[in-house]
UniProtKB/Swiss-Prot annotation:
Pfam families: MAT1, zf-C3HC4_5. This is CDK-activating kinase assembly factor MAT1. The modification Phosphothreonine is found at residue 51. GO terms for cellular component: CAK-ERCC2 complex; cyclin-dependent protein kinase holoenzyme complex; nucleoplasm; transcription factor TFIIH core complex; transcription factor TFIIH holo complex; transcription factor TFIIK complex. It is found in: Nucleus. Stabilizes the cyclin H-CDK7 complex to form a functional CDK-activating kinase (CAK) enzymatic complex. CAK activates the cyclin-associated kinases CDK1, CDK2, CDK4 and CDK6 by threonine phosphorylation. CAK complexed to the core-TFIIH basal transcription factor activates RNA polymerase II by serine phosphorylation of the repetitive C-terminal domain (CTD) of its large subunit (POLR2A), allowing its escape from the promoter and elongation of the transcripts. Involved in cell cycle control and in RNA transcription by RNA polymerase II. Associates primarily with CDK7 and cyclin H to form the CAK complex. CAK can further associate with the core-TFIIH to form the TFIIH basal transcription factor.
Length: 309
């Protein structure tokens, strides 16, 4: 595997571990120093392909292959236009065709295949579906807001749980110190034997530990269905697909041999007399004597009637 490096100044990460590689829309890599040198005015051409680039569009290379970074950025731009969802299509087949079209566009733009026709196709689609694109953008914005709100609620719950646990630990320490101090005071002032005082102290410590270990009731945050309290759910009807139902057809296998008895008949016909009975451990793993015997008979009978042609 070739060591990563800048193709212009030939600096590699082996010689400079702090080397920061940058990539732009064309997918060619430059180090941060070369970017600052070549794009002093804020814009310039790629030294490899000559594509006009802006300095502000350079970003840190995340993947070893810069083509992957290029594809990620192209996919983001394409999905901003082709943002339809499954519920926008009357059938699953049309939705799958739409996804295949998106993948074809991303592939063409990433690998510089038929760029003019691909870009023209995107412009036509954007003009014809302007309203749908805007509606899905607003829908996506609402979903992002709901997601951020849910994350914020979860963060607050985690913070409250952390503070509650911290408070409980502090309370436990205080109670233990009080119990210890009470025991020392009794040793100083009481006339009872030390063994009796020690036994009483152990009893109180045990009761205190049991009280502290008793689980506190947790306030429910979700319903029994798994839906979080306060969460708004969509009640829109689900699109029904009018398709033919699946019909099971038994598997027909030509074994060129005698007919093998059914599983239920093996015991009556005496096939299981000399087969090891299944133990409880075998049954737990899915093994049954009749199934093993049935498989063995299939192997034994297979090909007995076969004749070379």
């Amino acid at each position: 595997m070739d060591d990563q490096g800048c193709p212009r100044c030939k600096t590699t990460k082996y010689r400079n571990p702090s080397l920061k590689l940058m990539v732009n829309v064309c997918g060619h890599t430059l180090c941060e120093s070369c970017v600052d040198l070549l794009f002093v005015r804020g814009a310039g051409n790629c030294p490899e392909c000559g594509t006009p680039l802006r300095k502000s569009n350079f970003r840190v290379q995340l993947f070893e292959d810069p083509t992957v970074d290029k594809e990620v950025e192209i996919r983001k731009k394409v999905l901003k236009i082709y943002n339809k969802r499954e519920e926008d299509f009357p059938s699953l087949r049309e939705y799958n065709d739409f996804l295949e079209e998106v993948e074809e566009i991303v592939f063409n733009l990433t690998n510089n295949v038929d760029l003019d026709n691909t870009k023209k196709k995107m412009e036509i689609y954007q003009k014809e579906n302007k309203d749908v694109i805007q509606k899905n953008k607003l829908k996506l914005t609402r979903e992002q807001e709901e997601l951020e709100e849910a994350l914020e609620v979860e963060r607050q719950e985690n913070e409250q749980r952390r503070l509650f646990i911290q408070k409980e630990e502090q309370l436990q320490q205080i109670l233990k110190r009080k119990n210890k101090q009470a025991f020392l005071d009794e040793l100083e002032s009481s006339d009872l034997p030390v063994a009796l005082l020690l036994a009483q102290h152990k009893d109180r410590s045990t009761q205190l530990e049991m009280q502290l270990e008793k689980p506190k009731p947790v306030k429910p945050v979700t319903f029994s269905t798994g839906i979080k309290m306060g969460q708004h759910i969509s009640l829109a009807p689900i699109h029904k697909l009018e398709e033919a139902l699946y019909e099971y057809q038994p598997l027909q296998i030509e074994t060129y041999g005698p007919h093998v008895p059914e599983l239920e008949m093996l015991g009556r016909l005496g096939y299981l007399n000399h087969v090891r009975a299944a133990s409880p451990q075998d049954l737990a793993g899915g093994y049954t004597s009749s199934l093993a015997c049935h498989r063995a008979l299939q192997d034994a009978f297979s090909g007995l009637f076969w004749q070379p042609s």
